[in-house]
Amino acid sequence: MATLTVDFFCSVDGNGSAHGWPGYWGKEGPELRDYLVQKYAQDQVLVYGATTFRAFREFVADYDEPYYESLNALPKIVFSSTLREPLGWSNSTVISEDAVTAMARLKRETEKPMRSHGSISLNRALLAAGLVDFLEVTIFPAITGRAGYAALFEDGPEFDLDLVESTVLDGRTLKLVYVPHLHTGVPEGVGPQRRET
């Protein structure tokens, strides 16, 4: 069975984007670039919602990042009821059926790892359905405040997280990899205990 990793870049206050801020919140460094090159050099399937797919399709055409060649070469699927093939990005396939149903089937049918980046609505649904094996959060040293938007965890279900990897990139950006578990309540006896009188 394939694993699914949800990959989320965010500010310290949890926003995936911010008005008036550049890509990577202006904090891109050599270790971050090397990490991205290595990550996308791995054999995997990239998973997108329609909005993020359109954005990345434009990024790889208009910008020059060292890992974009790998993005072009890797197989990609986009969940969308409106997009039609040809999609204008090499090795891309559209899936129009319900994303949760389709992802559960895809995970059973293949061994190749899958990775979804951005795609807030899609990844909220996949997380809520318990289909995400790894949650990779890269936290950039910025607080975006009122300018921030696209928070993945806002208004969603609750999760307990097992930390399996932590790395500091360029001395300032934190990459955390978790195994998520839907939160089912706090066990009795956990947390501060009231003193008996």
Role assignments for model-derived ranges:
Residues 1-197:
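Enzymes that bind and transform nitrogen-containing heteroaromatic metabolites
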